[in-house]
């Protein structure tokens, strides 16, 4: 593995869309006691369903701590590769490398800086050194050269690419005080163009209400095809999410992509508000002496937090009447893939969902 100090755009590399073919997927075995209630037992069951579904059509690598290796190996399908690598938590989307390709059979990774979604300003845990090493270590594991961009804080969940020159981000996240406060919006956009290999960045104002990542784009909006997106939506104007989704809709309707196309927006309904119970809170350890959740707190539940595998779309379900409607919409948008709904409340309690715990490895 070489550590590169050029940029992907300079070298003819770009971030492909998630709906492009994959070689595989990266996930991390959940363990952290202040993220995953009651010893992560229920979370692991949900992770296993995600792993089993994705690994039917692409290779799967799972990282785990040395202490969890035997337990994880006993539960994971034999086809899944299990690797000991220390992490601070299980958010593969945000700590794993962002992979870029050149269309000529080469793939490289990007090692962004990671500071637990806000560092000393509003980060979610006090120490993130292990997480900040994952991207580079994983690139070494798969023998891919890596671009060093640790001086720029960026998580995989905060960026989407259509593979044809357009990126999708939120202002709430990318311009947050805890990430790159010394850079202007224009400078941040240039970094995205240089490293994602895009020529157009569509900025959505906001994400999902109460999303503690400062409103990652992957929870509110995602490309389903070039020039097409799904947008998390509610018709309830009294819900605080309505104004956030409406602002994003306005931005999308005013935008064109890198190829000059208007964006076709498919509204994906939200479930009714999901809140955490006192019993669930009691199952979480304190973080730095403070509780990580309070009973009744609204969680950032959204069907947009799905993963596009080679032969499946793996979406979260919440035991809500909207589960079936969201699944039907996604099935219409992805006719060549099977849309699989997985009960994901136990992932949501940790702070994210299915897209947040997965990271695709594009095929070359």
Report residues per predicted region:
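Histidine/cysteine-enriched polar flanking segments
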Residues: 1-364
